Amino acid sequence: MIKPRGENQIQYLHNILTHDISFGIGPAGTGKTFLAVAAAVEALERQEIRRILLTRPAVEAGEKLGFLPGDLGQKIEPYLRPLYDALFEMLGFERVQKLMERNVIEIAPLAYMRGRTLNDSFIILDESQNTTVEQMKMFLTRIGFNSKAVITGDVTQIDLPRSTKSGLRHAMEVLSKVSELSFNYFESKDIVRHPVVAKVVQAYEEWEAQDEIRRQETAAQRRAEREQKVRSENETNLGE
């Protein structure tokens, strides 16, 4: 069994085991996807579920996978590589291949899940910050009886067009008070990769926070200038 590190990972794994739907939100390297896969593998080993389903939005391909060469697995394999890596580390390459041949482990692009009901399954939606609101709702309503779902993502790494709201951000707002769901948040201090990764993430977080302050100050200054201009024009008009 994979052992969690740190309080946030311990709580996250506990929530996965005690909730049917759990969200793991935070930067890369915090173990949110790895622990979800570990929980799925353990549930399969204990015969608590019949299959593991891995999915993520293929934003880079616009989910137009029909234009890519190969069968379905080959088309979306590059987008699911982090999940494969976790599975291979836990079960070994050959066993994963055999389980996939029997559809015990299934991979599917998010766009292909519409219309399905997933019973007796452990479903992991990775990179969920790149889902649209409609895709997130569709995914959450696919979950059937005796199934668990873990949704992982990083709201600082959204690849959607600026005009498109992230389904993960929307879910965080809409579902935060649903007690049957768990929301688990990770920070740069929770990163369990090379120590320099945590420092890199922290540096970016600090820069982004300062950049947001700068943008707000610039916007406030522009508003003040516009208001001053309007007042000056009004005073000029009154003088005439």
Where are the predicted features?
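Conserved helicase motor core of SF1/SF2 NTP-dependent helicases
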Residues: 3-125, 129-240
